[in-house]
Amino acid sequence: EIYEKYQVEVVADEIWSDIILGDHQFVPTQSVSEYARMHTVAMYAPSKTFNLAGLVGSYHIIYNPVIRDRVKKESSLSHYNEMNVLSMYALIGAYQQEGYEWTDELCKVLTKNAEYAYDYIRSHFKDVQVAMPQGTYMLLLDCTEWCRKHGITIDELQKRGVGVGVIWQDGRPFHSPCGIRMNLALPFSLVEEAMDRLRKYVFV
């Protein structure tokens, strides 16, 4: 309603929309109202779900022909945005029935990983804040209080993890000044091992 009141056009990055955890549901931005449908550029890609990031297979859905023409014009200025034959067939193949079955199984695995990591962190890493994600395979740890109490910086904490083979990511580019971003897209046994290493060697 606010967007409609001020005639705002929306660019919605919905690249994670396939990866929904537990019983949660994804609501496409374009589905919430007729105004949203006609004033949203929704962007998708198979790269997160099917690990196809290198193939330049992203795409957009635009119902408004005027906005679509504007986006097509801007996109055409760089040949990098053009699909190639390999990426086109990879995209088609990903969204066949087998791809849907793969995605269902993937979400079950990721849900188990996220639930385990969330419970483990809350049980073992006092003063580390974490929220159970509803989607994606990323987990964001807020280490503000932990770092303050232990007198170390987030850079030092991140280095500790890397030093014991837990490759995690600086959370600052994701609006978390003292955060660490963890990728949980891996076998469950490795999630267990990573948490065990963090308990023994990092959050000590």
Where are these regions (language model features)?
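PLP-dependent class I/II
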Residues: 1-204
